[in-house]
UniProtKB/Swiss-Prot annotation:
Its EC number is 2.4.1.21. It holds the Pfam family Glycos_transf_1. GO terms for biological process: glycogen biosynthetic process. Keywords: Glycogen biosynthesis, Glycosyltransferase, Transferase. Pathway: Glycan biosynthesis; glycogen biosynthesis. The gene is glgA. It catalyses: [(1->4)-alpha-D-glucosyl](n) + ADP-alpha-D-glucose = [(1->4)-alpha-D-glucosyl](n+1) + ADP + H(+). The lineage of its organism: Bacteria, Thermotogati, Deinococcota, Deinococci, Thermales. Belongs to the glycosyltransferase 1 family. Bacterial/plant glycogen synthase subfamily. It comes from Thermus thermophilus (strain ATCC BAA-163 / DSM 7039 / HB27). CDD domains: GT5_Glycogen_synthase_DULL1-like. This is Glycogen synthase. Synthesizes alpha-1,4-glucan chains using ADP-glucose. It is an enzyme of class 2 (transferase).
Length: 437
């Protein structure tokens, strides 16, 4: 079985968030199961690859051509499409993102002709479901890919007969994610709990009705973690290796983390995107009480400008209690996972989440909200703590409960958990078989 993963990002070539980790790791785990899986990405700026050909495709009624590159990393074959509009620094965040990714998808469908099945990821690849046998994965329902219908049908050449409620239409616009849900043979999302939640008005982002209508082909498969990449026993970013059996090296990591940040323990760490989805407003509101109780806060990430300003101000006002690193720095992230006393994952909603898995693997227990994949991965009261209420008091309660029950002991128990891709890969192989009938 030959499967082409089509996505906007994949580790280690291009990474913005957890989507990249999934697309980089799943194909590697599928190989031993008899699935030949390759990854197709846009040829983003700065990526080096060997040019292996050219792809001809139609866009806006005319033929275009895009160079096709190839690169092998970690045993995975990556293909890069150099369509117009890419070659820039960022993966997302440009005014013409819809046009760029539709052009990419139309070129990708030509590459897909050589495969049995397409595995399309999020809105940027959803269009493939209209052209090829597709398994479509929703990583985050909040980003749906809304496009003006006049532009969409001009760019793609698809018939206007698709612009109705049972197909692509969504409140007067084309919704690419809706198209993926409707036209894919199977739809997956990244945790069992999130698959249930998105069928409700609270979490469905306006697509709950569509998802309920297509519930028969919806599966929730928990993301795995690349346990070769995230392994404290051989992590090159740590000052000393450690394992659950011999955790002595963790003390070295804590010491190095303290030296780098200037924060005395106990330190609560947040590593990830600066986004209100991630519950950072709760962290800011709870911060005065946390500092009063003797906790320190380390925050690392980029994203929303308002949140960035708020954490910069918090650091200025509390130089001994808060440290903010507004950057993507993998070395510091690994040190935080290993050296903090706990990680905070207070999300409003969370399709799966990788931070809580990585931290657990590094023996640092999570304090997480009981939503989505966090419910499926954090063993409450044994290897971390879950809290229900989206309120600063809920977060404070979770932090206090963790330390009352024993944060260090919970961290050691968290290291026992199996977050490898082996189980999820088997589940995806079964979904592929269903999709191919």
């Amino acid at each position: 079985m030959r499967v082409l993963h089509v996505a906007p990002e994949a580790y280690p070539l291009a990474k913005v968030g957890g989507l990249a980790d999934v697309v980089g790791a799943l194909p590697k785990a599928l190989g031993p199961l008899g699935v030949e899986a390759h990854v197709l990405l846009p040829w983003h700026g700065g990526l080096e690859a060997r040019r292996v050909g050219e792809v001809a495709f139609a866009f806006f009624g005319r033929e275009e051509r895009a160079p096709l590159g190839e690169r092998v990393e970690g045993g995975v074959r990556f293909l890069l499409l150099g369509v117009e509009g890419f070659g820039r620094e960022r993966v997302y965040g440009y005014p013409d993102d819809a046009e760029r990714y539709l052009r990419f998808a139309l070129a990708a469908k030509e590459v897909a002709r050589g495969y049995d099945l397409v595995h399309a990821h999020d809105w940027t690849a959803a269009l493939l479901a209209l052209y090829a046998p597709t398994v479509y994965t929703i990583h985050n329902l909040a980003h749906q890919g809304l496009v003006d219908p006049g532009l969409f049908f001009s760019w793609t050449g698809l018939p206007w007969s698709l612009f109705h409620m049972e197909a692509l239409e969504f409140y007067g616009r084309v919704n690419l994610m809706k198209g993926g849900i409707v036209f894919a043979r199977r739809v997956t999302t990244v945790s069992p709990s999130y698959a249930e939640e998105i069928q409700t008005p609270e979490f469905g982002m306006g697509l709950d009705g569509v998802l309920r209508r297509h519930a028969g082909k919806l599966r929730g498969i928990l993301n795995g973690l690349d346990t070769e990449v995230f392994d404290p026993g051989k992590d090159p970013y740590l000052p000393a290796p450690y394992t659950r059996e011999d955790p002595s090296g963790k003390a070295r990591a804590k010491e190095a983390f303290r030296e780098r940040t200037g924060l005395r323990p106990p330190v609560l760490a947040y590593v990830g995107r600066l986004d209100y989805q991630k519950g950072l407003d709760l962290v800011l509101k709870a911060l005065p009480r946390l500092l009063e109780m003797g906790f320190r806060l380390y925050v690392q990430g980029v994203g929303d400008g308002g949140l960035q300003e708020a954490f910069l101000r918090a650091e200025e006002e509390n130089p001994e209690g808060v440290r903010f690193l507004p950057a993507y720095d993998e070395a510091m992230a690994r040190l935080a996972y290993a050296g903090a006393e706990a990680v905070l994952v207070p999300s409003r909603f969370e399709p799966c989440g990788l931070v809580q898995m990585i931290a657990s693997r590094y023996g640092t227990p999570p304090v997480a909200r009981a939503v989505g994949g966090l419910k499926d991965t954090v063993e409450d009261g044994r290897a971390g703590v879950l809290f229900e209420t989206y309120h600063p008091e809920g977060l404070l309660y979770g932090v206090l409960r963790l330390f009352r029950l024993g944060a260090e002991e919970m961290g050691l128990r968290a290291m026992e958990k199996d977050f490898s891709w082996e189980g999820p890969a088997r589940a995806y192989r079964e979904v592929y078989r269903e999709a191919l009938g």
